[in-house]
Amino acid sequence: MLLQRCVHESARLHPSSPVARRRAECPLTLATDEAVERGELVTIDLLGANRDEKIFGPDAAQFNPYRQTDKGSSPYGLSFGLGMHACIGRTLAAGVTPKPDSNPLDHQYGTITLIASALLEHGARPDPAKPPKMDEKTERPNWGYYPVILDTPQS
């Protein structure tokens, strides 16, 4: 289950979008005492929220797959949204958060963990003849090109 914990921690630190936007359905006051009127657009800083030391501890900005979160906090933070705005594919992608008594043989790891596991089992490694390249058309750090070599399966 360590690989799944690595996937969750990576998703927390590197959400697919750094922000989320929601429109207020009623007047409210934020924790910062800022008033928000009905219909106003509110921007949620996912990068900041996912690094909140009150929730993720003093090393919140660091990669730590052994991180423990309080009940009610997900190990991947707000990266998949929350409530009615939660990503419909969250469980398919990230799987079910393991519990102490989870059976590794029938645990639902999620497709990201299963794909990463298959790549590791096949010896996936960077292709030294074709170095990876970042996508320069976006401000976010995304790979545009990352060729790998796989070992030939033994029959």
Predicted regions span which residues?
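Conserved cytochrome P450 K-helix E-x-x-R motif and the immediately C-terminal K′/meander segment
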Residues: 1-34
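Conserved cytochrome P450 K-helix/beta-meander segment immediately N-terminal to the heme-binding cysteine loop
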Residues: 38, 44-72, 80
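Short, glycine-/Ser/Thr-/acidic-enriched flexible segments
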Residues: 48-50, 85, 93
